[in-house]
């Protein structure tokens, strides 16, 4: 994502949202051959996409069979879907982990206030076993950023959880 968008998206209002989304659609179309191919297959292009409702969404199955990336880059990290037994997991390649972290932290703080005002308690049984789960990554980062010693993962630690909550 070009630098101007990374700063623009965090201060966007409802009026500017649609225009920015259309700009990002055009960028994706121009710089992601897989996405452009899909958009063309469903008869969508910058010539006929004029509103949010016109923007085509890439099906999840593409994330299982392709490396979905806009421009060429080495990813900082990738996340995998949980999937089910015997299936191929989808992958989400992250170009800039700092931008990813800024995004979910700003989203949290926009809804709940400063992270330092919160204890973050993670109860994520099946996710903790997945080494590339985005939810575990996000919760771990929120735990770290909260700065509270009582923040943490409490899977199977019911006594400790009870004490923390009381």
Each language-model region and where it sits:
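Nucleotide 5′-phosphate-binding alpha/beta core
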Residues: 1-80, 86-116, 121-122, 126, ...
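Extended acidic/charged loop-beta regions that coordinate divalent cations
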Residues: 134-138
């Amino acid at each position: 994502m070009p630098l101007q968008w990374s700063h623009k998206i965090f201060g966007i209002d409802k009026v500017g949202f649609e225009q920015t989304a259309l700009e990002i659609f055009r960028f994706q179309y121009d710089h992601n051959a897989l996405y452009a191919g899909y958009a063309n297959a469903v008869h969508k292009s910058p010539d006929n996409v004029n509103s949010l409702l016109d923007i085509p969404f890439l099906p999840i199955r593409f994330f299982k069979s392709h490396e979905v990336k806009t421009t060429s880059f080495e990813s900082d990290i990738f996340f995998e879907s949980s999937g089910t037994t015997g299936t191929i997991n989808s992958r989400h390649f992250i170009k800039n982990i700092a931008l990813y972290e800024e995004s979910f932290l700003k989203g949290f703080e926009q809804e709940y206030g400063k992270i330092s005002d919160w204890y973050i308690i993670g109860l994520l049984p099946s996710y903790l076993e997945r080494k590339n789960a985005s939810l575990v990554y996000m919760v771990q980062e929120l735990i770290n950023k909260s700065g509270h010693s009582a923040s943490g993962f409490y899977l199977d630690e019911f006594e400790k959880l009870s004490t923390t909550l009381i």
